[in-house]
Amino acid sequence: MSVRPQNDFDGKAFAAQLSTAPGVYRMYAGDDTLLYVGKAGALRKRVGSYFNGTPKNARLTSMLSQVARMDVTVTRSEAEALLLENQLIKSLSPRYNVSLRDDKSYPYVLLTREQWPRIALHRGPRAVQGRYFGPYTGVTGVRETLSLMHKLFKLRSCEDSVFRNRSRPCLQYQIGRCSGPCVDLVAAPDYAESVRRATMFLEGKSDQLGEEIMHSMQQASEALEFERAARLRDLLSSLRSMQNRQYVDGRAADLDVLACATQSSQACVLLLSFRDGRNLGTRSFFPKTNGEDSADEILGAFVSQYYAEHSPPREILLDREIPEAELIEAALSTAAEHKVALKWNVRGERAGYLLLATRNAQLTLVTELTSQSAQHARSEALRELLGLAEPVKRVECFDISHTMGEATVASCVVFDASGPVRGQYRRFNISGITPGDDYAAMRQAIERRFRRAVEENGVIPDVLLIDGGAGQLAQAQAALADLGVENVLLVGVAKGEERRAGHEALIMADGRELRPGAASPALQFIQQVRDEAHRFAITGHRGRRQKARMTSKLEDIPGIGPRRRASLLKHFGGLVGLKAAGEAEIARVEGVNAALAARIYANLHGLALPDAAGEASPQ
């Protein structure tokens, strides 16, 4: 239900006509900006509490002074209200709620759900059907897990496009890291059994898995199936070896440890994870707060929101008691379909884990605040150097990368006073220009970036850095003028003498040059932004160039048309398989004779190409 008042919002009257059922309430400002999302065991009582008496702190006073209307959603239980509250906070990011930064970049192990499941590293939205295990503290942890999984269970890692088109096993099969389901070298029931065991391992049930494998090995031995018994023995040996390397403490088999540190209106929540006795490392989160949230409120919000997106372990240690712990515990247990216990008064080893997490949270927050302080100082120095009246809130920098005109890519990176805003980085694949024309590439990138901003009333930077001299700066100026973009300070960043860092010249739109010197905090900030733009452009360029070269390898060979190219790639399961084949193997592909096979082999290995005379027409 919703009420939009004609005049000032009457919170008491609104609360009086609400149900006493549990639910979620939302507060909106006059311009429909969402201010706050909350949950209630009894809507009438909870909403009414905001408007009875004086707000208990400045944050509430500020928030309530802006409320123009409220919405409520009735739920069946308070636990259901808690889940809905977390979903809304995650998707809508209300101004006054404690909210987590997006964690889509954290890596997971993905086990796909299909006839022949694939196991692989995964980042980003969960668009692929399957089970996601994690998140891990970094890519290294995922790769170590995947390497172990391939050795133990021999599950495929190839993409479906490669899997469907192979005609012979790949290198992974040859080195004993895949069972070869692509060419029917493993029976479906056996592969399914490997998937089941891999799932048990990822669920932290390696002890149970070891007992099961030992039992199967004994059965195989009794049945005189000695080859199968030997395979199971090797599997068990590898599993035991892994457990001995990674075992930490059997009593911390499946456990998360959370600690919250606060300082200067900022907070850090540190997560230390153990799975099957293995220390998976730590991750730090910096929730958005309003300066007056207490550490227990911040930690409580973190627990609710984080485990709404990630599978909780059976035991979660907290460095302090959190509000509504019993309710959160019940909601997590219901969602996870197993008992989840929240604990804060612990002894022995677990107290040691909490102490470790607490110290790390405090150190991480101090490091973050120090970094932010230095970043703010550099941003302020930039404002003074450029003569701006207002603080610099947003800086963008463009750079161009290519190899002799090939695969040209432009990058746009974004910084604010706190540092890089990586979620707003953009790359532009440049096309339709003379190869190697950096001026045209810069103009195209600027036009594409700011045309969208003009059409959609998007955000415009305070300062726009152009990596290059007067020529690139002039192109950016012309592009912005054509689009009618104003109030952007353009600065060209030209290489210094002998291209030495610290000797850069800053070229202003009016032709002035500034040379702040290597000791200038403002120049250090510009160098940081410029170097990040350079890195981001090069990474994009290399990826585009590699993709183009892989695609064009066969296209450049006389006698290879679309049909033959498709036949070759299908026969060998891709360019990698084709490159590993000899001339005789290539010549067995339908439509490829010995002469053409020799040309293909020579092209792929950088050898002198045989004469193409007498070849059939491309197909």
Curated annotation (Swiss-Prot):
Subcellular location: Cytoplasm
Entry protein name: UvrABC system protein C
Protein family according to the UniProt entry: Belongs to the UvrC family.
Name of encoding gene: uvrC
Organism: Xanthomonas axonopodis pv. citri (strain 306)
Gene Ontology BP terms: nucleotide-excision repair; SOS response
Domain of life: Bacteria
Record-annotated GIY-YIG domain positions: 20-98
UniProt keyword Cytoplasm present: yes
